[in-house]
Regions:
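A short helix-to-beta-strand connector/capping loop
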Residues: 61-69, 197-204
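Charged docking surfaces used in two-component/phosphorelay signaling
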Residues: 72-80, 209-216
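A short acidic, amphipathic alpha-helical/loop segment
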Residues: 20-22, 80-84, 111, 155, ...
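Gly/Ser-rich helix-loop-strand patches that form or flank binding pockets
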Residues: 80-132, 221-276
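Short, well-ordered secondary-structure micro-motifs
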Residues: 47, 105-106, 152, 178-182, ...
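Glycine/small-residue-rich hydrophobic helix-like segments
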Residues: 181-238
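General small-molecule cofactor/ligand-binding pocket signal
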Residues: 35-37, 69-73, 124, 168-170, ...
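Small/aliphatic-rich secondary-structure junction motif
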Residues: 1-48, 138-182, 192-203, 256-257
Length: 276
């Protein structure tokens, strides 16, 4: 019996295949259980818990290899998502993104980011079903001059260790000596962390400049054949004026036209170590 779970968040069942296919692979990769989660929230026009149970039971039978369980709850979507680590022993969630969904839809990109904004576990946003026979074979992440997220490196290492993924570290060229020094220190920190786990990576230089650098990182990762990007969301405590008015980087890469799955990690003060 598994005691930690990948959470397949089936918002309104409109992206069931997309979410479940990725969640099943994550459960196998991490050797965790799988929970199919449905939330009946009175603020949205959704099937009742009783109606949802029928679909959830059918989905359980369709995936005997991972032996999923299901949970159907009533309540506030965001509050339940925030409680996933303690409520369901969740370690990572998978959510579907529909770039054509109306703003009030639970699968609308902005709505997904809003509902997961305070989530303490990583969450994978997906736009299409997992069809690759070797899923996540190339996983990208970027290193810049900002304070490095150890949890991002931990998650990147999971893909290398448990999925045998090839890691691609993307970075910009910094002409400013101060920024270059900060970036170099982050690389040294990463190298020390990865060396202890015997994890290797390739480097890829990102060309160009943009108001939101992660959008170029996302495009470069897709062009390089990467099948997943690990990204840290903007700390709301540190947002500048531009970000408050035009949005943060995650608002753009979540709906990337190449449909690259994005594993988002919200900034947090503590580190949640999932696997040894």
């Amino acid at each position: 019996m598994k005691d930690q779970f990948v959470i397949a968040y089936l918002a309104d069942f409109s992206m069931t295949q997309e979410v479940v296919s990725h969640a099943c692979h994550m459960a196998r990769m991490l050797n965790k259980g799988l929970i199919l989660l449905y939330i009946e929230d009175s603020r949205y026009h959704l099937p009742s818990v009783d109606e949802a149970e029928k679909t959830l039971l059918r989905l359980e039978k369709e995936h005997p290899d991972v032996n999923p369980a299901h949970v159907a709850l009533k309540g506030n979507t965001r509050e339940i998502i925030n409680a996933l680590p303690t409520l369901l022993n969740g370690v990572v969630a998978v959510a579907g993104i529909d770039t054509h969904a109306r703003i009030g839809s639970l699968c609308n990109p902005k709505r997904v980011l809003h509902n997961f904004a305070q989530c303490k576990i990583a969450y994978l946003t997906v736009q299409q079903p997992l069809a690759d026979p070797t899923p996540y074979s190339n996983v990208a992440f970027s290193i810049d001059f900002h304070k490095e997220s150890k949890e991002k490196l931990i998650w990147a290492s999971y893909f290398a260790r448990f999925n045998h993924s090839r890691l691609r570290m993307l970075h910009f060229q910094y002409n400013d000596p101060g920024l270059h020094n900060k970036w170099h220190n982050n690389v040294l920190f990463m190298d020390k962390f990865f060396s202890g786990l015997k994890v290797t990576y390739d480097t890829l230089t990102v060309e160009g400049r943009a108001l939101f650098p992660e959008t170029i990182v996302c495009r470069t990762a897709a062009d390089a054949g990467c099948s997943l990007l690990v990204s840290v969301t903007t700390d709301t405590r540190n947002r500048d004026v531009i970000e408050w008015f035009v949005g943060a980087q995650e608002d753009r890469i979540v709906r990337n036209p190449r449909q690259l799955p994005i594993l988002f990690i919200n900034p947090r003060n503590d580190i949640y170590v999932l696997c040894d």
